[in-house]
Amino acid sequence: MGILEKISEIEKEIARTQKNKATEYHLGLLKAKLAKYRAQLLEPSKSASSKGEGFDVMKSGDARVALIGFPSVGKSTFLSLMTSTASEAASYEFTTLTCIPGVIEYKGANIQLLDLPGIIEGAAQGRGRGRQVIAVARTADVVVMMLDATKGDVQRSLLEKELESVGIRLNKHKPNIYFKPKKGGGISFNSTVTLTQCSEKLVQLILHEYKIFNAEVLFREDCSPDDFIDVIVGNRVYMPCLYVYNKIDQISMEEVDRLARKPNSVVISCGMKLNLDYLLEMLWEYLALTCIYTKKRGQRPDFTDAIILRKGASVEHVCHRIHRSLASQFKYALVWGTSTKYSPQRVGLTHTMEHEDVIQIVKK
């Protein structure tokens, strides 16, 4: 029996098993086996040919956004509207066959937008060009999932399932579980909270399935067996996802209202150029970027060339971005903007910068 057949059998077994106290250990074991087989499936085969166009796109700009969706949902049209890149667009499926990068210039930042080929059902098993598409998506800062509004929620659940099966966790945080394999001493299990989904016996069963017999486990929050398996495997990617429903000009106002109220969702129409500005604002929020402007002594601030950093960046991060030796020569900084009580305020390396702050660095 091949890996795909084993995965299919386990999925069927999970689907037909009733979830209750008596079956939780059995389900936990099945989920651990499923995660193991999926990991094996994603390992590149040694006999795989290296022919064909590659998908590797050099990371450029201040952030990377992956555009994922089924064929013919409007990804290429969206890329052409948002950037100066012409991605071939047509009303038939599979127009885009390789990864096409474009750059959005917004609020002084260069955001790399990748138009990935359409994902078909079964992409995680290697159908279509699914594996390469998903591998590129793992390197992004944010996933924009383009969906056809005329098809309701069918596409969304299928795509979520495909990404989930390859270790991409959308709009979730990393489970707060401490896990450390040891050379001896058996399994040490502790928790700082009341656990309602996992027990010590279930944790031991899952660890034994992975041939781990000595480890230290500490649950700092109430997590599910799936979360614990993610911690053991360790190669999961947790990233924000924005669900974008395109073609809203083809559905009723009631349906538009229903889709717009869903969490992490934006409704647009590329054909009529509707709501694209709001989508850009949401994308900026999800990327959590801040623009910092620099100022030389006795001169006006340079508003033409911003330093783009992650939200919560400190003065030290600004120093490293300007020059790697600047932090060691740092004396103090003067900051103008919303992060200070008065302008200018003299601050140290640990001061947290806000969006559109102006900084002047004084060296020793």
UniProtKB/Swiss-Prot annotation:
Binding site for Mg(2+): S76, T96
Ranges of residues in domain TGS: 288-363
Highest taxon listed in the record's lineage: Eukaryota
Location in the cell: Nucleus; Cytoplasm
Purpose of the protein: Catalyzes the conversion of GTP to GDP through hydrolysis of the gamma-phosphate bond in GTP.
NCBIfam families found in the cross-reference section: small_GTP (TIGR00231)
Name of the protein this chain belongs to: Developmentally-regulated GTP-binding protein 2
Organism: Mus musculus
